[in-house]
Amino acid sequence: MINPDNNDLYDLNEALKVENLTINDYEEICKRLKRKPNRTELGMFGVMWSEHCCYRNSKPLLSNFPTKGKNILVGPGENAGVIDVGNNQKLVFKIESHNHPSAIEPFQGAATGVGGILRDIFTMGARPIAVLNSLRFGNLDKTSNMDLLRGVVSGIAHYGNCVGVPTVGGEIDFDDSYSGNPLVNVMALGLLETNEIVCSGAKNVGSPVLYVGNTTGRDGVGGASFASSELTITSLDDRPAVQVGDPFIEKSLIEACLDAFKTGDVIAAQDMGAAGLTCSSAEMAANGNLGISIDLDLVPSREDNMSSYQYLLSESQERMLFVVKEEKINNLIEKFNKWGLYANVIGEVIETNEVIISHKRKIVAQIPTSALSDDTPVNLHNVMKNPPNYLLKKWKWNENNLPEINEQKIFSLKENKSFSYSEIILKLLANPSIASKRWIYKQYDSQVQANTVFKPGESDAAVIRLREQNEKNKSKVFSGVAASVDCNSRWVSLDPFRGTIAAVAESARNVSCVGAEPVAITNNLNFSSPETEIGYWQLSSSCNAISEACKALETPVTGGNVSLYNESKNRDNEITPINPTPVIGMVGKIDNVEKAISTEWKNINDQIWLIGSHKSETTIAASSYLEYFHGEITGRPPKIDLQDEKFCQSFLRNAILNNFVVSSHDISDGGLAIALAECCILSAKGATIELEKDLNRDDNVLFSEGGSRIIFSIDKMKEKEWSNYLKKIQINSQSNVYVKKIGYVSSEILKIKIQDKNICDISVEELTEKFNNSISGYF
């Protein structure tokens, strides 16, 4: 037992405030320990009982996710999910957030976000093969938002480029709700290199516990608690809670760990991420149903006179904790030292289910593992039965609220003047949320490792060739994986359930658009405080939607991250919550990457087709057009029929597999007109399009948004075969689904007619100039 005389004297109220604990939490801690905690133990409980580590507000909602499927090898509970992608290959993947650190130290916050998610991947025995990111910032007309964007992109680029993992795709959106609280979500993928998946549960009493990697300092102390609280005007004072990363040590750590794992001498592995040594030791012990004892005097440190509290709560980067075979310890230490890494035995696995910490020859913490990991508190909340009144009011909006169309011009409620359709298309293309993200992704090395099939921006999803390090594939037919991150935050803010359904559907659609079969998801739930009625209702509605959509599309959840309290408070204590942003990271598999297709048109006179669903709604309510042209964020997002969504995606994949489709692009932000323009821009080719008239308004035809819609082009040399194929599969007998030709690829001009009426006539050069120079124009 811990000696009561070792308990620190501390101000309880102040300590609880620092650790973000309540007096009820403290009483529960005393009950679990059967005594009062000392200051070090209170800090350990503070980080382990934070939302960031134990999901105390979201755990009941997450339990409803579908987590099993034919390709799922490892689901939630380990460092990352694992799926079978065929040919005896296993893909490891996960998404994590680093929102609060990036708000106050954008470069290091984003850089260490990349480092942390990479460690989750290679801790499982996988070589990281790709990184994607999902970013949110306030509008770029504010210098502070420009600075945050510049810092975050630089941090992601620096760490990913230096460590040698390609950044292959992502998404970014701008909205004032993120001005005080940007979102930085990073997804990583890895290909398993070990014979067995490396898990985190400690085994074999008496086995040594090995610390590997960088030294421990005071950086990042309390980072998990910091990430579980709102940002205020004084949050800049929390800069010490932001970690400092070294990608070159991370690179050595990747190679050394994979080398060590292949020996079979590592029994269990856990990276030291959030809550550092506290979390890694507690989770290893709990997952193995054993205990761990650690002597802090043996931990390599970079600073003098560190307290036990600082050792245990430090989130210094590039550190790992292993349980290893005792007879192999010297061989392993030699391997790690060869890579310039510290490798010290700092403890052992013990039989009792406790985490016991010693420092300066005294026991400074002794806590049951269940209290830190398995049996953590759950905050139960009542869920609102009905949507809030402010949303019910917005849902009543319809297109009759807009000005009438007069002589092919539309009056903008935002700018108080009329514009032609061509002018509107150009204005939408220049909006930073729709415009090219080239200024961002050109800073990333997307080609390192030489397995990236399409460069960022060229396809709806990233496609990675799966190639072992020692390639023995003589046929040169490589399978691959596709990945996409998606979320329309505007839709989720207007209807959390429908908006999240759409996020899952769009991520699967993007993967299908390159010819890959969607397999599984990881998710990053970015929300505001769950302690408000509306905040928890948004979170609950979104989780219900993920469950429903993933079941319908047969894409189970393998894990992810919950980031709550994403809101900012100004000097007047006014709280601004972010738009709820449940980012979906979808992965899919493709048997032959040579069959993967990109977005741009391929040949002049190729036919352009549209597939969609009559049951999946399309509307200009909640659309980009309504926000960016009319200045209104209102209306109810369209409902998506998930069975039709699944059918449309399957139809497209089969058409790609049968070598008919040569390009495809999903219709999302900005509607059909923007999707067509993007295909023209990427190919430097035009399109001649003729569309059916809408009963009410032509802007509905051009700019409405909804699910289940994809444009694709058919090889001009296969028109007859394509026609026979459609007859054979009787596509139009599917009463809810339509497949129709809408035009053909032409040169230099995007021409759109609606019912024989010329709507727009824009040169590809003009489209490209607006699209490519928007974001870069701010810097």
From Swiss-Prot:
Top-tier EC class: ligase
Residues that coordinate or bind ATP: Y55, K94, N523, G560
UniProt cross-references to SUPFAM superfamilies, sorted A to Z: PurM C-terminal domain-like, PurM N-terminal domain-like
Pfam families, per database record: AIRS, AIRS_C, FGAR-AT_linker
Pathway stated in the Swiss-Prot or TrEMBL entry: Purine metabolism; IMP biosynthesis via de novo pathway; 5-amino-1-(5-phospho-D-ribosyl)imidazole from N(2)-formyl-N(1)-(5-phospho-D-ribosyl)glycinamide: step 1/2
Family: Belongs to the FGAMS family.
Protein name (record): Phosphoribosylformylglycinamidine synthase subunit PurL
Organism per entry: Prochlorococcus marinus (strain MIT 9312)
